[in-house]
Amino acid sequence: MLLSLAQWLQTISPELGFLRVFQYLTFRALMAAMTALLIGLLAGPFVIRRLISLKIGQPIREYAMQTHLSKSGTPTMGGVLILLAIGISTLLWFDLSNRFVWIVLLVTLGFGAIGWVDDWRKVVLKDPEGMRSREKYLWQSVVGLIAALYLVFSISESSNLRVLELFMNWVRSGLDVNLPPKAGLLVPFMKEISYPLGVFGFVILTYLVIVGSSNAVNLTDGLDGLAIMPVVMVGSSLGVFAYVTGSSVYSKYLLFPHIPGSGELLIFCAAMAGSGLAFLWFNTHPAQVFMGDVGALALGAALGTIAVIVRQEIVLAIMGGIFVVEALSVMLQVTWFKYTKRRYGQGRRLFQMAPLHHHFEKCGWKETQVVVRFWIITMLLCLVGLSTLKLR
């Protein structure tokens, strides 16, 4: 918005040359981060008071850790604050004509809406289950598949009209069309190795990345500050990849696919980092507010969508290794418990408790130890992911 305003002012008043600074992506990214940070810090106390007045408190389940019982009643649905800061900051600082930022914003809001309904049912309607699993996955699938169908052609073309034309040609040709190499699965640490996916392969991969990332972040969000800091670190790292793939110079030099327009995603990533740090101010132990599903599902989906656009799905799995392991721990625990119950008549556990962060608490780690150690691991994994920029 401000970029368009600056460009318009320059056309009517050429002497306002200093407004050219708005054309620099790095400047706007810095401003987006600062704007989101300030919005989060200033609006945070009001949002928390409002949540308390509405009695939107986090219910603690009976089988939860004993040390967590004191958290009962802590305001939840604080993810609204994160989404508010991201939305306002991004709209102020990004190029409004950029379709990639719009699709990430819409996916984020879509998954945020799903999480909002889930949280509302839990804390307001007093339904301990919230949205039923099938219902939740249905709506996640709807949003994820719509995004995947748009992105499969959007990455190939720089015009929305051409995207629509490609989609219609795909339908008329019997759902068979070749995608350019840059739409393939990029293998990290390998020089210019990209496995072709085809339309169906791309759509399936995109769906799995977006929905999987969303639920993985949601499963990780179980301790004060545990999920938000890794989201900030992974999101910031993806912003670097967006900057590279959006630049014809850097992408050519680093042997990355050039995806025109993807650089603007740096604005969204910066806003996500700023809003995340602001939220951490209130979410650090002992937390004054929890993000809830409205925040966790939305942020996870945003990370997945950005990774797909910049063709870094595997790198996302590396940098977000904590999210991956947390999700796997739940799947393994459930699968093993059902298998042993069917075979031996009594269910057995692989972990003392799942997700994995609760297992470490059961092993004697304090909550703050688990959180900070997971942060350190994420920081190291992000460095590994960023090293793929050059180590190829």
From Swiss-Prot:
What's the protein's topology in the membrane?
Answer: Multi-pass membrane protein
Enzyme Commission designation: 2.7.8.13
Biological pathway? Cell wall biogenesis; peptidoglycan biosynthesis
Cofactor field: Mg(2+)
> What GO terms fall under cellular component here?
plasma membrane
Superkingdom: Bacteria
* Reactions the enzyme catalyzes: UDP-N-acetyl-alpha-D-muramoyl-L-alanyl-gamma-D-glutamyl-meso-2,6-diaminopimeloyl-D-alanyl-D-alanine + di-trans,octa-cis-undecaprenyl phosphate = di-trans,octa-cis-undecaprenyl diphospho-N-acetyl-alpha-D-muramoyl-L-alanyl-D-glutamyl-meso-2,6-diaminopimeloyl-D-alanyl-D-alanine + UMP
- InterPro entries per UniProt: Glycosyl_transferase_4, PNAcMuramoyl-5peptid_Trfase, PNAcMuramoyl-5peptid_Trfase_CS
Give GO terms for biological process.
cell division; cell wall organization; peptidoglycan biosynthetic process; regulation of cell shape
Keyword Transcription: yes or no? Answer: no
List where the protein spans the membrane: 28-48, 76-96, 100-120, 137-157, 193-213, 225-245, 262-282, 289-309, 314-334, 369-389
Q: Where in the cell is it found?
A: Cell inner membrane
What NCBIfam families has UniProt attached to this entry? mraY
**Function according to Swiss-Prot or TrEMBL:** Catalyzes the initial step of the lipid cycle reactions in the biosynthesis of the cell wall peptidoglycan: transfers peptidoglycan precursor phospho-MurNAc-pentapeptide from UDP-MurNAc-pentapeptide onto the lipid carrier undecaprenyl phosphate, yielding undecaprenyl-pyrophosphoryl-MurNAc-pentapeptide, known as lipid I.
What HAMAP family would the database entry show? MraY
Family to which this protein belongs: Belongs to the glycosyltransferase 4 family. MraY subfamily.
Matching PANTHER family, A to Z? PHOSPHO-N-ACETYLMURAMOYL-PENTAPEPTIDE-TRANSFERASE, PHOSPHO-N-ACETYLMURAMOYL-PENTAPEPTIDE-TRANSFERASE HOMOLOG
The protein's name is Phospho-N-acetylmuramoyl-pentapeptide-transferase
Q: Which organism is it from?
A: Polaromonas naphthalenivorans (strain CJ2)
